[in-house]
Amino acid sequence: MFADLHIHMLLSGSDCKAAIAGHPPHLDDILIKERLSAYQSAGISYLRDGGDRFGVCLRAKELAPEYGITYRTPAFPIYKKGHYGSFIGRGWSDFAEYRALLAEAQASGADFIKLMVSGLMDFSAYGVLTEEPLTGAEVHDF
């Protein structure tokens, strides 16, 4: 079995703004099916999506069995408001909002929870993130 363990069916791999604009307000089943078919042709039978706030990953999860693909997704990534993640995830500012997002993810059919704890790695500077990560206490509490 071959797997890809960090995909976002929503994104194209080149222009994230254009990729996001290509879906809402309606999901593009043709595009999702083309991508699932490409994975199938490459012999990949397991995909783990990082999720998105538009529902593309959930639709892909519904379609994936037609291609012999096991598809797992968190439904949407969860991030702290004011930090990295607003372009693709759902945000929280307090524990009550966080718990509500957990319940919504579960009701949506999430297979796991993705909590965004930092920005991106800065590939031009070893060990540097693009923004301050959540504190250890915040990660522990949430």
Which functions belong to the PLM regions below?
Residues 31-58, 68-79, 110-124:
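Divalent metal-dependent hydrolysis catalytic cores, especially in the metallo-beta-lactamase
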Residues 28-37, 92-106:
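Short, acidic/polar
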Residues 2-62, 84:
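Metal-associated gating/positioning segment near the N- to mid-region
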